[in-house]
């Protein structure tokens, strides 16, 4: 189940190896939010369940949260976002990642969308 997966709330998770994954928000989400001005990340070691709040996001337009797409333990956070939250706007699928997790249950990925399904989903929103 490697690859890039998406939620209907516009979060993404990229599975990197057997247990490790990176989490962030999509280009669609950052575009809807506008310029990000603040990101609060979880603590390394935090145990999060699927759908739990993983991060707090504030932009010039709104405040919201990133919900974790699958259950897991936070293993690393992108500390650069504290000083440069705009990295999320500039590169949401790259340097704008939020945190890494050790995935607890890969079967939870089955409820997520692949890139093609997500693209169709966001096209249906416009």
Segments predicted by a language model, with ranges:
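Short, glycine/small-residue-enriched coil/turn segments at secondary-structure junctions
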Residues: 1-3, 66, 70
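Acidic, low-complexity mobile loops and tails
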Residues: 1-50, 86, 90-126
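Residue-level recognition of beta-strand microenvironments
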Residues: 13-15, 60, 71, 77-80, ...
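Short, charged/polar surface micro-motifs in flexible loops or helix N-caps
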Residues: 30-31, 44, 71-74, 79-82
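Short, solvent-exposed beta-edge and connector elements
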Residues: 32-38, 60, 68-71
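Short, Lys/Arg- and Gly-enriched loop/turn segments at beta-strand edges
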Residues: 58-67, 84-86
